[in-house]
A protein has these predicted regions:
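Conserved ABC ATPase signature
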Residues: 48-51, 250-287, 291, 295-308
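Single conserved hydrophobic/aromatic residue that forms the stacking wall/gate
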Residues: 321-330
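Conserved P-loop NTP-binding catalytic core
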Residues: 42-44, 49-50, 54, 64-121
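Pre-Walker A-like glycine/lysine-rich segment at the N-terminus of P-loop NTPase domains
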Residues: 2-68
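Electropositive, glycine-dotted interaction segments
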Residues: 114-244
Length: 330
């Protein structure tokens, strides 16, 4: 579960920007008890949040910041700032501006982690990982690394045994230190990498142009799950099934409908309406939220979820909560 995300100096954002899913206290919390979930770590977290803003107000750049952070975990390339992602004003004011990304989340091992990295055009300036078991409990620093004036990385704080090995031959900034520690067997680093790669989905609408065979296989597994069809058919209740195309599922899949006389007919997804095609893709992400406890950021979701469809999705989710609340972690 995502708790908080902060960043600065990214695209249109010059100053620090913070996004928090902590539920507010007071009367608002009491009025909407179904809008948040209580965790064993002492956090009350919102289940959903809506980012509202005018056109060109920075909503997409906000999500792109998360995409960029996630991409640093995906590759073993040199980690450094890219001029096209640095705020234009800062780029003119500073010779080597720094960008900070900070994320706090509840991982699958039920620990709270705070991960932060600061990067510039030279590479990683600093990187740290902190673990805690409760919202107000003492923090345990896994590692806190800083690049000094001689471009040498040093450990400021931390108890991870694997840090010494990770620091060797690491002055080229290839790959994040947290990824290196995960490869060396550090459990806290592994939990962080696992969450970033397999739990966080920042606004990527699935498509046939997916760049990972593994991710496409995961999408196919979801589409072939009967529960996925229950979500997808909310866009049109005449839909009664699908025949998934394994090579191009987002365009060549056949949508099966049944008319009032009970007769079935099929249509290729690419020939269907824009609304049906887009909801077919977003239904995969809705499935991940409902059944796999993923954290999904959806950009321009209002293109897909009109008021009627929104009510259907919410009613579907609430029905699952009421049925399985005693046994299911929300």
């Amino acid at each position: 579960m995502l708790i908080r995300y902060m960043f600065d100096n990214f695209c249109s954002f010059k100053e620090e920007c913070e996004f928090s899913l902590e539920a507010p206290g007071g009367k608002v919390k009491k009025r909407f008890p179904d809008n948040y979930t209580t965790t064993e770590t002492g956090y009350d977290l919102l289940k959903t949040a809506v980012i509202v803003g005018e056109n060109a107000g920075g909503k997409s750049n906000f999500i792109n910041g998360l995409k960029y952070l996630k991409s640093l975990f995906d590759t073993n390339m040199k980690v450094q700032s890219v001029n096209s992602y640095i705020n234009a004003d800062t780029l003119m004011e500073c010779n080597n501006p720094k960008q900070k990304f900070n994320v706090v989340f509840l991982a699958g091992n039920h620990y709270i982690y705070e991960y932060e990295t600061i990067v510039d055009t030279k590479g990683i300036y600093s990187e740290k990982l902190i673990r805690s078991s409760q919202r107000k409990s003492a923090e345990h620093v896994v590692f806190d690394i800083l690049r000094d004036q001689e471009d040498i990385y040093t450990l400021r704080r931390g108890t991870a045994r694997e840090v010494t090995a990770a620091l060797k031959n690491s002055n080229n900034s290839n790959g994040l230190f947290v990824v290196k520690l995960a490869l060396l067997g550090n459990k806290d680093a592994s939990a962080t990498v696992e969450w970033m790669l397999n739990v966080l989905y920042p606004g990527n609408i699935p498509s046939d142009n997916i760049d990972s065979i593994v991710r496409q296989e995961r999408d196919l597994e979801i589409m072939k799950d009967p529960r996925y069809v229950e979500i997808f058919k909310m866009v049109d209740y005449s839909i009664c099934g699908i025949e998934v195309d394994d090579e191009k599922p987002y365009s060549k899949t056949l949508v099966i409908r049944k008319n009032a006389q009970g007769k079935q007919f099929k249509r290729e997804l690419s020939q269907d309406s824009t609304g049906v095609r887009e909801f077919f893709a977003w239904a995969v992400q809705i499935f991940r939220v409902v059944y796999e406890n993923k954290v999904v950021f959806a950009d321009e979701m209002d293109r897909v979820l009109n008021p009627i469809l929104s009510d259907r999705v919410i009613a579907y989710i609430l029905s699952l909560i009421h049925i399985s609340e005693p046994t299911r972690r929300r």
